A protein has these predicted regions:
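Generic detector of well-ordered alpha-helical packing
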Residues: 41, 107-108
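Glycine-rich phosphate-binding loops of nucleotide-dependent enzymes
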Residues: 104
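Conserved P-loop
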Residues: 2, 6-95
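A short helix-to-beta-strand connector/capping loop
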Residues: 58-62, 100, 131-133
Length: 173
């Protein structure tokens, strides 16, 4: 029996490109005239291409960031990070009710791995997503429960990733 909820896509793994994969699908949806909502957990930097893009196409593209300014690692997580992740999840619940074609929950897997969110609450929310809405979950170290729940799961690995080559504006961010 097919569930009456949106389709869940999960991108995880230690390789780069999980957010980039999600953004590619977002671009595809936008090209067809559909609405896209991106909620970024643990991210705050506004100098990324995906964040700047909202100025170009404001009517069908929404992006929200819920990260502590200056945050750069998992070693110094605080209650503020937990609070911001809760706000991000609440925003996702609100936006899902608007039935966008695509809802991207960027880095939610990492937020779950860091225990900033409750896995049961996230899965309960995903069960309520309207069937018209496709959801993409990104981030390293996706919990096994989420992997089992998702409809499609992709693991991203780096075959080759030279550290001496710097990141490039417009490519990696």
């Amino acid at each position: 029996m097919v569930e009456e909820r949106g389709t869940i896509y999960l991108y995880t793994g230690e390789g780069g490109g999980k957010t980039t994969n999600a953004l590619g699908l977002a671009l595809r949806c936008l090209g067809h005239g559909y609405k896209v909502v991106i909620i970024q957990f643990l991210k705050w930097w506004k100098n990324t291409g995906e964040y700047k893009f909202k100025k170009i196409l404001p009517e069908n593209y929404e992006i929200y960031q819920f990260g502590r300014k200056g945050w750069k690692g998992l070693k110094n997580l605080t209650d503020k990070d937990r609070e911001l992740c809760r706000k991000a999840l609440n925003m996702a619940k609100k936006k899902a009710k608007e039935r966008p074609k695509l809802l991207v929950l960027d880095e939610i897997n990492l937020a779950l791995d860091c225990k900033l969110l409750d896995i049961g609450e996230v899965i309960d929310f995903l069960k309520t997503v309207p069937k018209e809405t496709n959801v993409i979950l990104t981030g390293r170290r996706a919990p096994q429960e989420l992997i089992q729940f998702a409809d499609f799961v992709n693991e991203v690995i780096d075959i080759k990733h030279p550290d001496e080559i710097p990141t490039v504006e417009g490519i990696q961010y």
